[in-house]
Amino acid sequence: MPTKAKLRFLLITISFEILFKAAISQPIEGKWRGAIHYDNIEVPFAFEVLKSTDSLTELLIISSGDTMEINNARLKGDSLFVPLGVFDSELRIRYTNAEMSGEWHKNYQQLPGPLFTATYKQDIFSNHSVSMAPVEIEDRWRITLMQPSGGISKALGLFEQHENQIASTILTEVGDYRYFEGMIMNDSIVMSSFDGVHAFLFAGSYHVTGWKGRLYYEPGYYENWEAMYDNTYELTDPFELITTEPGASRPYYDILTAGGKYNIINTDSLAGKVVVIQLMGTWCPNSFDQTNYLINWCKSKPEDVKMIAVSYEPGDKSYAHQRLEKYKKQMKIPYPMYVGGSLSKGQAALAFPTIDRINAFPTLVMVDKKGFIRYICSYFNGPATGDYYLQFGTEFEKRIEELRNE
């Protein structure tokens, strides 16, 4: 090959290498607008790329009053893999300088996840007007959720409004929806929430009698909702939704942990103690919030109180044990945790045959020193609910002291 031709070939090769490296440079640091796509519905959320190297990226996912810090996102070529906190899900992304696209994947599900996209330096509701809002939704609203099957459930919406901006949470009798943020535009409202497990879009418009709209949960599924202003409305207290008579029933600990050979609760260690049993799942954000509360409570837990957790997971037992071990390590949980079985409230209820039902994950079952079930906290109001979260702590600790003093 002639010398000039060799030189030209070398220059072309170097140019391609430079262009290739530029194309797969690290994601741009700064604020991004992410979105999960459900068919023609988009669930937006904010995140920030804090720091990026050749192999790792640090991100911060932001949702109203909540943040999820991620310091172990992995770079591989033009792909970015973002594990979503302690949950077994991740964003699988291909990126250019100012755009990302990919999939939101839950590792315990075989089907492909919803589409994910992101754009650099864009507000999460950038396609909406930011004029002054003529309609107000601040304070508390009684919400009715209507399922496609015909089922109806009640909820309480707590809203804070600053001009067009909305911060909110929605409480139900199976747990709260955690942190929403959004906007009011003229007579319409739109709010979103993304926590790594759920991506919710709450959208509607104002009518003469109140608000009406849809709450989108996942591809192909939504519930209609209606909201009426009611500043005295309350849900049933979580400690009163399901009750039991003192001395009426005991937990079946062998059934509780599915009788696994290496997964057995030592009941001798519980004798003469107040026992708190948390029924939970590593896939559940409400369980995550309650577990954080219990971790902190255990720092000053009395010696005559025992705390245990029993988890109900998707997939087989091998997966469940692996998930629970990782979850316990990541969260530095100081109390014993056991695999209870597959993800089923019916399965969880088998260990408590005299109780009407297990209403939700998480559920707390409180057992007195004689071994009888005394109290059941049937759902959890997490930190997004403000005063209701503080009220849970007060009521929980009051019942602990009552059982200790018997």
Question: Where in the sequence are the language-model features?
Answer:
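Bacterial Sec-dependent N-terminal signal peptides
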Residues: 1-31
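Central antiparallel beta-sheet cores of small beta-barrel/beta-sandwich binding domains
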Residues: 27-95, 127-128, 135-203
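Surface-exposed beta-loop interaction hotspot
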Residues: 110-145, 238-245
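N-terminal "domain-start" segment that seeds a small globular fold
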Residues: 230-267
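Short active-site neighborhood of thiol/selenol oxidoreductases, capturing the structured segment around
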Residues: 263-294
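Structural microenvironment flanking redox-active thiols in thiol-disulfide oxidoreductases
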Residues: 289-332, 344-351
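Structural micro-motif
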Residues: 332-336, 355-365
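Thiol-/selenol-based redox modules, centered on thioredoxin-like
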Residues: 360-406
